[in-house]
């Protein structure tokens, strides 16, 4: 084919590459129509996994989504009621209550049951009760355990309303108030209370010894030593026989014991000394002898239950600040016939105190709390629902504080609160929605809240679009867009109707759980786009020069081999620039796609067909130009070889003729001359 035809064709194809690259680059750097449809890629968040990205919002959407499944309910119905309180002080506590729901069904059920209490308002007694309960929760280091214990305690109190039961409760609480170690005291009381009636009866002699003691601590230690010693029966018989004789004759029991003590083995010395202490610290040696004789006769000193009881009693005496009161109280508890209910309350108290960071403070709070609840019958019937709500919360302290704030607000804003209450009631009557159902609802919810769901990413701009892909707006052109997906999503949510709810829940940019492959790779995005943009610019520049070069050469009648090589060199670079630019942009897109897929946020990344169509078409045309130039160069080279060969033949023929002429004979020359 004539190169004069091929050169203009190559110029036209180069012009096409030039224009396609310019349009692709301009489309992805501008924000005016119609080239806004040309972009690198877009991110569709219409079905984003909200519960994963914003866990705080998950339970809220579950509640609202469940309400949406009710008959004749629309997004406007649900979120319209929520918008009505968006500017009030009730929004934050309500959202925190729902957000803290570890068990959505239990939370909803409890809230609807507690709603009448909120509408009734509060009085001084209710406020005092709430304050005490709030203080109790604040001191907790394990709120779940504390709530379980307090719930059990209240249940036990409500089922045991006898005066005896109330007296026992007061006795226990008094012991705890006087204790330097409320937890240790409670556990020791549980040990004593778990004993059978027969075992408790056997402890009566012990209390008789304490009643006649001048030093309760010394007496207790001495008894514990005796119980933990093994004394031969013969030694015991000899000891008590001598003591009876000595006391009958008006002698001193202590001296008698000391005389006998010198005759016993060293292993029994501590036990003998303990007996001496008992007689030294008593107000009546005869009473002490009688009690000890009874204890030995009934084998109390060797009883395992008695030994355990003595250990618990010793601990109680060590912890108390009033030993006399303690012994009286423990004796009354031991003689009580309501041991089972008392034990349940003690176990509940132990659970409460163990879950508290300050047991002494809790001990002072519980009597006040019990008293207020016992006297406030209106509030008392809501207590089970209150504990159910707090037990279903991941942060009971925050939930209780939120409930108190809502109660105060609803008291004076019942009309505004009622629509929201209806939504909660409708949600509690519906089956909790599944994650798949929530996913299908997400697009309509995002659209209602005016949150852009399509993000079109170009080189210098970011465009936001509705679900139907009509544009919200585009950013002004500036430096290469950063693929910081967290910032992109957060900034757009900040500009939507969802902002009040974000503020109410104190959700900041760093609270968005968008960590993963996509976010980790964002630092590679800007350098890659810059490199691709540089390739495009180089492609445009070299295409322009090649196009001009081709047009100029098309006017020549002959194109030398060197010029063809120059054309091929330039065309090769155009192919490289165009191919690299297209490849880098494709790699960027696939990088975002794979990152999004691995992160599993249900964000769909897709490329722009017009953009990649323009880029790769430009590359194909550049390759065609290179092939045409290569063909022309090859044809030119072959043509030059033929010309050289013909020239060589002509030169050879000319040389041959000259030689023949030089060797012609003189006769032939004369004949030729004659002619």
UniProtKB/Swiss-Prot annotation:
InterPro entries: SUR7/Rim9-like_fungi, SUR7_domain. It is a multi-pass membrane protein. It is found in: Cell membrane. N-glycosylated. Keywords: Cell membrane, Glycoprotein, Isopeptide bond, Membrane, Phosphoprotein, Signal, Transmembrane, Transmembrane helix, Ubl conjugation. Residues 554-568, 632-675 are cytoplasmic. Residues 1-28 form the signal peptide. GO terms for biological process: fungal-type cell wall organization. Glycans are attached at residues 49, 72, 103, 142, 160, 194, 215, 228, 252, 286, 299, 318, 322, 358, 375, 405, 429, 468. Its main location: membrane. The chain crosses the membrane at residues 533-553, 569-589, 611-631. The keyword Transmembrane applies. One of its GO terms (cellular component) is cell periphery. There is a cross-link at residue 671 (Glycyl lysine isopeptide (Lys-Gly) (interchain with G-Cter in ubiquitin)). Residues 29-532, 590-610 are extracellular. Induction: By anaerobic conditions. The keyword Glycoprotein applies. It holds the Pfam family SUR7. The modification Phosphoserine is found at residues 654, 665. Present with 4280 molecules/cell in log phase SD medium. This is Cell membrane protein YLR413W.
């Amino acid at each position: 084919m004539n190169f004069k035809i091929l050169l203009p064709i190559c110029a036209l194809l180069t012009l096409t590459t030039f224009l396609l690259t310019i349009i692709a680059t301009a489309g992805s750097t501008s924000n005016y129509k119609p080239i806004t449809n040309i972009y690198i890629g877009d991110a569709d968040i219409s079905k984003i996994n909200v519960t994963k990205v914003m866990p705080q919002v998950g339970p809220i959407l579950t509640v609202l989504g469940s309400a949406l499944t009710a008959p004749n309910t629309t997004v406007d119905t649900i979120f319209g009621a929520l918008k009505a309180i968006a500017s009030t002080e009730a929004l934050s506590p309500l959202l925190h209550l729902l957000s803290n729901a570890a068990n959505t069904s239990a939370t909803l059920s409890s809230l609807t049951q507690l709603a009448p209490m909120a509408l009734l308002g509060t009085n001084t007694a209710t406020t005092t009760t709430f304050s005490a309960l709030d203080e109790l929760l604040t001191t907790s280091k394990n709120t779940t355990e504390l709530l379980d214990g307090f719930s059990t305690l209240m249940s036990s109190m409500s089922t045991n309303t006898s005066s005896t039961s109330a007296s026992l409760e007061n006795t226990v609480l008094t012991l705890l108030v006087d204790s330097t170690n409320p937890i240790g005291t409670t556990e020791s009381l549980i040990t004593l209370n778990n004993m059978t009636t027969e075992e408790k009866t056997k402890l009566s002699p012990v209390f008789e010894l304490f009643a006649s003691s001048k030093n309760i601590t010394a007496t207790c230690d001495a008894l514990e030593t005796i119980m933990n010693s093994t004394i031969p029966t013969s030694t015991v018989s000899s000891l008590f026989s001598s003591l009876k004789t000595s006391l009958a004759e008006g002698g001193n029991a202590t001296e008698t014991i000391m005389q006998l003590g010198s005759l016993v083995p060293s292993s029994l010395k501590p036990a003998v000394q303990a007996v001496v202490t008992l007689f030294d610290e008593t107000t009546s040696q005869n009473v002490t002898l009688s009690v000890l004789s009874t204890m030995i006769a009934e084998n109390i000193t060797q009883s395992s239950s008695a030994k355990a009881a003595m250990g618990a009693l010793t601990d109680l005496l060590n912890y108390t600040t009033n030993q006399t009161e303690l012994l009286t109280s423990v004796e009354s508890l031991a003689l009580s016939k309501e041991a089972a209910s008392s034990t349940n309350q003690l176990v509940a108290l132990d659970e409460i105190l163990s879950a508290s960071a300050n047991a002494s403070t809790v001990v002072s709070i519980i009597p006040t709390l019990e008293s207020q609840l016992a006297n406030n019958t209106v509030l008392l019937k809501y207590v089970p629902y209150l504990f159910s709500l707090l037990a279903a919360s991941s942060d009971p302290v925050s939930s209780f504080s939120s409930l108190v704030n809502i109660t105060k607000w609803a008291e004076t804003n019942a009309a505004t609160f009622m629509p929201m209450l209806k939504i909660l009631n409708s949600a509690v009557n519906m089956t909790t929605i599944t994650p798949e159902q929530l996913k299908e609802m997400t697009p309509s919810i995002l659209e209602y809240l005016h949150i852009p769901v399509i993000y079109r990413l170009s080189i210098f701009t970011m465009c936001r679009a509705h679900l139907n892909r009509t544009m919200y707006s585009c950013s002004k052109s500036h430096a290469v867009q950063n693929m910081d997906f967290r910032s992109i999503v957060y900034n757009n949510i900040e500009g939507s109707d969802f902002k009040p709810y974000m503020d109410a829940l104190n959700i900041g940019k760093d609270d968005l759980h968008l960590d993963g492959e996509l976010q980790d790779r964002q630092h590679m995005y800007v350098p890659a786009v810059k490199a691709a943009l540089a390739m495009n610019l180089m492609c445009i520049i070299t295409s322009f020069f090649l196009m001009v070069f081709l047009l100029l050469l098309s006017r020549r009648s002959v194109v030398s081999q060197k010029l063809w090589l120059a054309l091929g060199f330039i065309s090769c670079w155009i192919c490289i620039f165009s191919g690299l630019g297209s490849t880098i942009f494709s790699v960027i897109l696939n990088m975002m796609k794979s990152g999004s897929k691995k992160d599993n946020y249900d964000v769909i990344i897709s490329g722009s067909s017009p953009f990649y169509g323009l880029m790769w078409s430009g590359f194909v045309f550049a390759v065609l130009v290179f092939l045409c130039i290569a063909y022309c160069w090859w044809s030119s080279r072959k043509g030059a070889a033929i010309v050289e060969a013909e020239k060589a033949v002509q030169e050879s023929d000319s040389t041959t003729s000259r030689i023949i002429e030089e060797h012609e004979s003189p006769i032939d020359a004369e004949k030729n001359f004659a002619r």
